[in-house]
């Protein structure tokens, strides 16, 4: 959902309203509706960098966990077919950690498919690496979001070994929140959410945490309520659609701008007709932009596409989008 800095040869999105958003906000030459379509496989060109986040629901602990028996779980095979046919210089794939932990045989199968892209002599054409990365210590955002990242570099193009980004210390959640009137004793409209909120507050007090004066993010809409101090649980699409988490010392849910910051994005200024609920859903379904930026910095350098590592953290000493958001929030509080 972040800014396009250079033209993208193509993108894939089947949601009609998100397609309109992409056209309004991003420089994309061709926008395909489905990766499964004949048009995609016939027309999608080779690129220097291919990035895909294939559907996570089949592998997520929040879903039914059907794996590749879920039709959405078969999208990975279309991705591999594209890689085989077009041989992009580099690729990055992302999915939930449940792919590794709950479906290890499927994960090993996916890795085997990627390593199994071979030349005429039967030699692997890609160097393939993978790692579980948490957005809080890699993306410099106060969100616990563990995802598996798989990267590949075409061996004939590779100039340097690929290295994963270094770990960093994230800011506290309070630094990313907008200045709004605080009503700590407020409760959600839903009686079920209220009961879960009260249970979370009781747990917090037992742990020596004061919900009225400390920033606690409560996931009071989930089947199993969870909470974190000055940080948040994982922001999912469903949670994003319901304005994220309940903030205890504020007495209310998060704003759309705050959800964007939680994913390392600048707040969206041109929604292109999307409602707040639709934006929140899309943000929760997206990559953490700052993790993506840091991994891509290493990947592009390894693939010989840049002559040095342009890592936002190493270059600026801090994550730029979140830093800008904090400066904006501080100015607003001072006014």
Task: Cite the ranges covered by each PLM segment.
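Conserved beta-strand scaffold positions in the cores of enzyme catalytic domains, especially
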Residues: 9-11, 30-31, 50, 128-132
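Glycine-rich, N-terminal phosphate-binding loop of Rossmann-like dinucleotide-binding domains
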Residues: 54
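Class I S-adenosyl-L-methionine
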Residues: 40-49, 57-241, 250-252
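Alpha-helical recognition domains of nuclear gene-regulatory proteins
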Residues: 25, 82, 113, 295-298
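C-terminal target-recognition/interaction regions appended to catalytic cores
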Residues: 195-335
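SAM cofactor-binding core of SAM-dependent methyltransferases
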Residues: 1-36
């Amino acid at each position: 959902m972040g800014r396009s800095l250079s033209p993208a040869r193509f993108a894939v999105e089947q949601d009609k309203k998100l397609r309109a958003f992409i056209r309004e906000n991003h420089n994309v030459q061709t926008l395909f509706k489905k990766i499964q379509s004949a048009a995609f496989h016939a027309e999608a060109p080779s690129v220097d960098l291919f990035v895909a986040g294939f559907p996570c629901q089949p592998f997520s602990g929040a879903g039914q966990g059907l794996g590749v028996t879920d039709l959405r779980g078969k999208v990975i095979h279309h991705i591999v077919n594209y890689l085989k046919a077009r041989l992009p210089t580099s690729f990055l794939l992302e999915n939930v950690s449940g792919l590794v932990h709950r479906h290890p045989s499927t994960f090993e199968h996916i890795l085997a498919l990627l390593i199994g892209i071979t030349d005429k002599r039967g030699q692997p054409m890609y160097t393939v690496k993978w790692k579980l990365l948490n957005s809080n210590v890699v993306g410099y955002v106060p969100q616990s979001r563990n995802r598996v990242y798989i990267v590949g570099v075409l061996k004939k193009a590779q100039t340097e070994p690929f290295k994963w980004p270094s770990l960093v210390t994230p800011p506290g959640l309070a630094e990313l929140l907008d200045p709004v009137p605080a009503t700590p004793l407020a409760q959600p409209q839903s009686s079920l959410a209220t009961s879960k909120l009260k249970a979370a507050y009781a747990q917090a007090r037992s742990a020596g945490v004061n919900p009225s004066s400390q920033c606690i993010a409560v996931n009071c809409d989930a089947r199993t309520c969870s909470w974190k101090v000055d940080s948040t649980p994982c922001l999912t699409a469903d949670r994003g659609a319901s304005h994220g988490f309940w903030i205890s010392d504020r007495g209310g849910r998060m704003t759309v701008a705050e959800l964007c910051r939680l994913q390392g994005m600048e707040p969206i200024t041109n929604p292109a007709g999307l409602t707040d609920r639709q934006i929140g859903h899309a943000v929760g379904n997206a990559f953490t932009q700052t993790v993506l930026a840091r991994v891509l910095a290493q990947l592009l350098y390894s693939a010989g596409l840049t002559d040095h590592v342009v890592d936002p953290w190493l270059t600026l000493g801090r994550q730029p989008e979140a830093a800008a958001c904090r400066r904006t929030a501080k100015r607003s509080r001072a006014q």
